Amino acid sequence: MDNSSIQELQQPLLPSITCDLLAPRSEKPELGTPFPETAFAESPRGWQLLLPPLPSVSAGLGEPETPDFEDTLSSDSDSDDDGGDRLSPLLPHDHLGLAVFSVLCCFWPVGIAAFCLAHKTNKAWAKGDVQGAGAASRRAFLLGVLAVGLGLCTYAAALVTLAAYLASRDPP
């Protein structure tokens, strides 16, 4: 391509760039700027993200109230209702079903240990020991899986022993 055709292709783009660079900037930020920037500001509550205001379809209805983060935390802590069936995302799973299954159907000595650790998970959570509850939950899960694995190995060994016994018997 020659130099004149490149300039013809760039011509529609160049005036808008030069006009934007030469135009005086107003003090008020425009809504929907082509390249929005992200800024952070330090406040007494820590670092906060400052976002440019977004255009709204309900511009004539007034500014919506933004809830204060501290107010929502204090109102949540004052209520005794935990929201029904919703569980806290921090509550570790106790793996009680796996522990019961491993006691009843698999290798019961290890399953009993998994069952005890599953109960320790809930007791530690009730006392407020989040780390202890998480550790007990992980150990209960590992012992439950170990009990299932040992139970499967025991059942497989029993089937192999039974097959060997039946194969060695003389036919009637």
Swiss-Prot record:
Question: According to the UniProt entry, which residue ranges have a biased composition of type Acidic residues?
Answer: 65-83
- According to Swiss-Prot or TrEMBL, what is its membrane topology? Multi-pass membrane protein
Which ranges of this chain reside in the Extracellular compartment per its record?
Answer: 1-97, 161-172
Compartments annotated for it: namely: Membrane
Q: Pfam families, alphabetically?
A: CD225
Which GO cellular component terms are attached? membrane
InterPro entries, alphabetized: CD225/Dispanin_fam
- Would you tell me the protein name for this molecule? Transmembrane protein 91
The encoding gene: Tmem91
Which GO biological process entries does UniProt record here? hematopoietic progenitor cell differentiation
Supply the source organism for this entry: Mus musculus
Q: Does the keyword Transmembrane apply?
A: yes
Give the Cytoplasmic compartment stretches of this protein.
119-139
Keywords from the named record: Membrane, Transmembrane, Transmembrane helix
- Which family does this protein fall into? Belongs to the CD225/Dispanin family.
Q: Where is this region: Disordered?
A: 60-86
Q: Where are the transmembrane segments?
A: 98-118, 140-160
